Amino acid sequence: SGQISNSDRRAVLDGLGTASSDYRHTIYKEDFSGRKGTLALSELEGFIDVALKHLEHSIHANKRKDGLYHAYNLMTVEADGGVQITYLPEMLEGQVAILSAGLLDASESVAVLDALKASALFREDQYSYVLYPNKSLPRFLDKNNIDPKALAGSALLTKLVEDGNADIVTQDCLGGHHFNGNFNNVKALRAALANLPSPYDALVASDQKDVEAIYEGIFNHKRFTGRSGTFFGYEGLGSIYWHMVSKLRLAAFEVTKAAVERNASSEVVGRLFDHYFEINAGIGAHKSPELYGAFPTDPYSHTPGGKGAQQPGMTGQVKEDLLCRFGELGVRVTDGCIQFDRALLNGEEFLKEPATFDYVNVEQQWQKLELPAGSLAYTLCQVPVVHLRGDTPGIEVKRGDGSTQQVAGLSLDLDTSRAVFRRSNDVVQLTVVA
C-alpha cells in the first residue's frame, strides 16, 4: 500500500527490465549446466501473490478523482534518473479494462458505470460512448510558437536568430519564432543540432537539453494519440468506436452476472441491469435509420461527431455481441455441459401472443415451430431452444428418434451437450422451463 516514489519506480523498472538479460548473459558465459533443481510450490505461489499485489496496487493507483480509471500512463525519465508518471485524458477503454479485470465488487462496478455516464465520454445524441472526450484543436497560427521568454533564455536559439540561421528556428513577418517545420520529432531536432556549423558547437553542448525541452514543451509528442486526437473522421474527434462500445457491453454483462451469482443486493443488481440495457440500446440495432445514419442492422466501424455511422463492414465487434446475446439468453457451458440461467433474461422478450419460429435445422432444412404466448425461442448449434416460464426448473430433451427425456434442473449432461455441439441430430429440440 502507499505511493511508490519515482526513484523506487525506477528501481523496479530496472530490476524487471534486466532480469531476463542477466539470465541470458549468464547462459552465454557459462552455458547450461544440465543440473536440475526443485522449485517448491510455495515459492511459486509466493511469487504469484507478490505479482498480483503489485498489479492490484497499480490498478488502484490509477483511479481518478471523478471515479473513472486512467487508461494509459506516460513515463518520463527525470534528470535524477527517477521515473515520473503522468496520464492521458479519460478513455473508454480504461473503463472497459477495469470492469473486465474482475477486481471490483458489484458496488464499485456500479460506481464506475455511474461515473462513465456522467463523464465527457457519454454522447447524448447517440446515447452511447466516445473513445475519448471531444476537444477543440488549436488553429494553425496557434501552433509551433516559441515563447519569447523561452527563446531569450536560450543562448543558442538567440544566437541562431541573430545570425539569421534558420536550420533550427525561423522568424515570421510578425516577429514570432517557430521551430523548423520539417522536424517531425525530437530526433530530427537532434540531427539538425548535430549538423550546425562548428562555431555553434559550444552553445549546442551547453544548450541542447534546454532546446529539446522547449521543443517538447510545445509539441509534447508523448501525448500524441494519432487520428483519435487530430482527425475529424475515421475514428477521430468525437467518434464512437462501436467495437469498444460492445466491449463495454460485455464488461457490463460480466459484472452483472457476477453480482447475481454473488447475491449482491437487489438495488445494486438492478442498477447494473439498467446500465447494461442502456449500453445495449445505444449500440444501434434498435435505432431508427435517421438516428443511426444507416440501416441499423448493418455493421459499421464508427460514428463521428455530427454524422451517421461510417465505414461499413464486419469488425471484431461481432464476437462481443454474440457473447452478450447468448449470455442474456442464459446459455452457459460449465465443464463441457450446457446450462441455462434466466437471471439476466429481459422479461419483455417473451412473446405477448403466439408466433411461428422459422429456423434451419442441422440437416439444412427449413423448419417451423409454433410458439405459445409467454415463450421465446432461439437456436443453439441449430437446435431450437424454447424458453417457458415456470416454477419448477427443468429441461425437456426431444431426440431425433422421436423420444423425449425430462431433466430436472437446468443443466444437461455431458453426452447430451456433446450431441448438441456436434450437430449430430440426436437432439432436435430443447424446452427449458425456468
Which residue ranges define each predicted feature?
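Acidic, mature catalytic/reactive cores of soluble proteins
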Residues: 1-434
